[in-house]
């Protein structure tokens, strides 16, 4: 019988990837992409679960992570292949949503073109993470077409809203989906062309900071209180908090990053007129959450750092900023390095790439957090995209790397399914931070 990896077809991967890129599934508008994948699943003799989880219901869930983009629901599709014998359940999952492409003038091609040049497929979401999603689809396809002579279950889930706090993964978990091991093919390809196996990631949360000022005529600027000037005082506190947090890093996989836990000011809005002193300012800020730190603890740390910094400021001590969490964001997460999932994937990757698989931790948050924290599913990240390409103009991905990752994940899934359920579940205790 042919090896399952022989069912990984480069032409089909290219076609599926181009088709997905051409669907402009900006977060909040993922229905067409999820529907496309649901239709793709229908060609296989698979169980399909396709539903919309209403936002009102999600908001009542105590695990609700918040959301920034307006939406009425979260569309999710799950496909399941059941083997001929009982055994473990392996989940391959990824998000369909992409960030807005920004100014089209910064792109060489239309952002959702899916143009192929040599080995690179171009388009918004190519690396983050439609290539990874297509690699997972190729795994599902390989098992569907090679027969059911395997134990256990293979579960494929396409979710929305990863770019908006992981709301889609919570919807999948609320739908009753669970597994003994989970792989998320987010972008982990290194500069050397070898994907890293990510077993831990930092968390992140979004905050809104409103800074009060006092208006005055620009010619009498000293009679006013510039909200921009006062924001710069707050900015100093933010940078000091970031410095202290990163100086305290002890996790060996996190210490290799120049800035494991980053704080970033993403937007600033303020003022009404060039000839008036700015009387208010609103900033949206992304704050890193350390491994072992809960989101609530991170928020308190950030808030206390600012309030301590401004306590002697004549204006801000009497007119403090309002700091409000926009969304809970992603908690940090970790799967222990001795978990059988890590060994299975590392061995499979070494067979495919002919080199040692680097084990790593990521400085960003993703859907791994939801599966680890809310479903207690051991989860790792391993995919063909490059994080340097993510959220950037002229995003692209290597077709060759996508095919290699797909074959790696086929081999990994085979190894996991051949394990005894108890072997995986005995290791199901994972490290998670809220």
Model regions: which residues?
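Short beta-strand segments
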Residues: 93-94, 157-158, 183-186, 210-212, ...
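Acidic/His- and Gly-rich active-site-bordering loop/insert found
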Residues: 2-121, 145, 150, 376, ...
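Metal-dependent amide/peptide-bond hydrolase catalytic core
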Residues: 1-11, 71, 188, 192, ...
């Amino acid at each position: 019988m042919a090896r399952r990896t022989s069912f990984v077809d480069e032409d089909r991967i290219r076609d599926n990837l181009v088709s997905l890129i051409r669907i402009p599934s900006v977060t909040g508008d993922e229905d067409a992409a999820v529907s496309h994948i649901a239709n793709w699943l229908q060609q296989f003799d698979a169980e399909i679960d396709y539903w919309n989880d209403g936002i009102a219901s999600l908001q009542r869930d105590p695990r609700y992570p918040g959301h920034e983009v307006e939406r009425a629901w979260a569309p999710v599709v799950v496909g399941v292949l059941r083997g001929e014998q009982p055994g473990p359940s392996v989940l391959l999952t990824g998000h369909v949503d992409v960030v807005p492409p920004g100014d089209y003038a910064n792109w060489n091609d239309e952002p959702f073109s899916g143009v192929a040049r040599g080995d690179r497929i171009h388009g918004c979401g190519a690396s983050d993470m439609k290539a990874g999603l297509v690699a997972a689809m190729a795994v599902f396809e390989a098992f569907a077409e090679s027969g059911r002579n395997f134990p256990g279950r293979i579960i494929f889930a396409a979710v929305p809203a990863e770019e908006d706090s992981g709301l889609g993964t919570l919807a999948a978990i609320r739908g009753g989906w669970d597994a003994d091991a989970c792989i998320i093919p987010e972008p982990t390809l290194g500069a050397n062309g070898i994907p890293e196996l990510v077993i831990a990631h930092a968390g992140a949360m979004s905050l809104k900071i409103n800074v009060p000022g006092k208006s005055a005529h620009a010619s009498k600027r000293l009679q006013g209180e510039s909200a921009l000037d006062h924001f710069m005082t707050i900015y100093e506190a933010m940078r000091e908090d970031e410095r202290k947090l990163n100086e305290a890093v002890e996790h060996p996989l996190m210490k290799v990053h120049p800035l494991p836990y980053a704080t970033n000011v993403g937007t600033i809005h303020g003022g009404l007129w060039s000839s008036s002193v700015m009387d208010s300012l609103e900033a949206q800020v992304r704050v890193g959450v350390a491994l072992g730190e809960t989101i609530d603890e991170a928020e308190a740390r950030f808030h206390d750092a600012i309030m301590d910094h401004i306590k002697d400021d004549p204006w801000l001590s009497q007119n403090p900023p309002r700091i409000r969490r926009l969304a809970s964001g992603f908690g940090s997460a970790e799967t222990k390095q001795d978990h059988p999932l890590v060994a299975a994937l590392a061995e499979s990757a070494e067979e495919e790439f002919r080199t040692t698989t680097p084990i790593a931790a990521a400085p960003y948050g993703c859907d791994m957090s939801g599966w680890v924290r809310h479903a207690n599913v051991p989860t790792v990240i391993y995919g063909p995209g490059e994080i340097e390409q993510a959220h950037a103009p002229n995003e692209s991905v290597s077709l060759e790397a996508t095919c290699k990752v797909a074959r790696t994940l086929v081999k990994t899934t085979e190894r996991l399914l051949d394990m005894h359920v108890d072997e995986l579940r005995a290791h199901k205790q994972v490290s998670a931070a809220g």
